[in-house]
């Protein structure tokens, strides 16, 4: 059995503006931003670049080869595809690791530094870990050979479809494509679209999980009914961090809708690619619906965090007000005692008793304030919440 190619890839939201910046960096190690030239040179050198081309295939892209035999294609919407044609059946997993290692340790650090200024990318914001789909392309393999590949790599098969031009077996991480008569270009176009789809869905799924986690953490605090004074600042700081992350991710979610129409238009204009996607059961409408669902859900998350922030800010204000009142009482007691002392003598005299009296008065004031602070920190404040109305008529 001949294995002709292996692919991996990823997707980060980009535009043709960033693509031109990538092109300048790849060609001349140049950037218009305030980045260290020495680092730019080091990152570019580490890419081991051979030839560089700028082309258009539905979208603009940059393509370059490397001294390792790995080819890289970066599209204007941020889709990144890497492949390695120097692959055999015996060295399959080593060849895949080679591509993944280049992606993680050569290409990604270079692009991360190139775009290190400005808002963080979605994968950093959401803590998204790369779980690559591996695409293994075979030439005219038998059904038994394809099944053997599946057994060696996956515990279960998700789906399989076949026609006169190709067969596709999909597991969890691996796609096995048996190319019968289809051109390499068409196979690659299908792989590009599948990587975009998986990455898009993966980001949305992570945002769904973040919504669940944040909602649950806020609910845990509210379910306690009371919170100690010393914990209020900790909770408000945590909520501020949630709010900041949520607002940044919100901007990225709103961007995602701009990429679907372009990809959909390009795919549907290519009859063979449209057929490929149709057979695999993919619908762009489903992706749009899922995005819209996450957008509505994210709006709810923002509102929920905002309401929790207002609630804890109110409690924080109450604690501050009580602390000020306590300090006022202690200060008034100290001042009153000092004034009474002045009335006991016709004129003040410097005596050992006076010094001790002043020291004791100061100690009492300091001790009183400490005690009040301890009481304030340990005092529990009500965290009230309005219950859901379950019987709306």
Please place each PLM-identified region on the residue numbering.
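Hydrophobic, Leu/Ile/Phe/Ala-enriched alpha-helical segments that form helix-helix packing faces
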Residues: 26, 30, 44-47, 56, ...
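Generic detector of short, locally flexible boundary/turn motifs and exposed helical patches
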Residues: 34-50, 134, 139-144, 265-267, ...
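Extended alpha-helical interaction modules
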Residues: 71-237
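Membrane-associated alpha-helical segments
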Residues: 235-340
